[in-house]
Amino acid sequence: MPTDNDLKAAILELLRDLDVLLVAHFYQKDEIVELAHYTGDSLELAKIASQSDKNLIVFCGVHFMGESVKALAFDKQVIMPKLSCCSMARMIDSHYYDRSVHLLKECGVKEFYPITYINSNAEVKAKVAKDDGVVCTSRNASKIFNHALKQNKKIFFLPDKCLGENLALENGLKSAILGANSQEEIKNADVVCYNGFCSVHQLFKLEDIEFYRQKYPDILIAVHPECEPSVVSNADFSGSTSQIIEFVEKLSPNQKVAIGTESHLVNRLKAKRHHQNTFILSSTLALCPTMNETTLKDLFEVLKAYKNHRAYNTIELKDEVARLAKLALTKMMELS
């Protein structure tokens, strides 16, 4: 049975032999992040991988991330050690998108501007592109939202209801959730949100903020905008994973901070701060189960199989889906 060090050495050798670009999302296991050429959030990695001069991309993340790279750089080969799903992305597909549009029309919504969070599959991004919409990430969501407001249409935000609600609150707008609010509320809302969510960021509650503030009156609270509106509106800072990292790294070592995002990322920030004055906001382990699936053995096996001409877990998209998804992704990049 090979040790972790044996696997790491073999992986590094295969990466060199195959001339691979290895990228890993911030929420991956530490041993995966350690080997990656680049780590980042979904947008950063999509840009890096699609613009790389490498023809083979190995993406350690969840499925929609690999699809985004394939859509942006269709000629590249994209493989994933594990075809893990994002629970939020699985909450909507092209059929559910069409059904949602039908429900909007039943509520008297004749025109809308769709924004899909990057946590959605390529077919959903393609549908949004067909309706002249755009993709957003947590990092550029405010810029994309401001662009959408200029279209003078009702905004349909999917699939994350929390990010949609938080953006509406940030702009003083009324929001409603499709399938949860009445037809009248949908008709009168400025922003209609699809009823999806992140299972990890739902763990953070207002009570957690109150607990830490009572215990440490000078503590700062930094959270991801996928958290519930009551959490985001009571935090000192809200931002994407990259923005949270930037925020925390600028703090004084003596400044206490509680962070509301995935535990792998928080633990790395704790280590950088010598495990002092840095806390995870929830008492429940905030671990993304699907991000946690990829192991060193998975990475080794997918590289070895590729070298032996037995490639698997390759990302494939239909030409038209890739073309349309790229339109929505490229539009986002131009606007942000």
Swiss-Prot record:
Its main location: cytoplasm. Binds 1 [4Fe-4S] cluster per subunit. Iminosuccinate binds at H25, S42, Y117, I118, N119, S138, H224, P225, E226, T241. It is an enzyme of class 2 (transferase). NCBIfam families: nadA, PRK09375.2-6. Its cofactor is [4Fe-4S] cluster. Belongs to the quinolinate synthase family. Type 3 subfamily. [4Fe-4S] cluster binds at C86, C198, C288. This is Quinolinate synthase. One of its GO terms (biological process) is 'de novo' NAD biosynthetic process from L-aspartate. It catalyses: iminosuccinate + dihydroxyacetone phosphate = quinolinate + phosphate + 2 H2O + H(+). Pathway: Cofactor biosynthesis; NAD(+) biosynthesis; quinolinate from iminoaspartate: step 1/1. GO terms for cellular component: cytosol. Disulfide bonds: none annotated. It is found in: Cytoplasm.
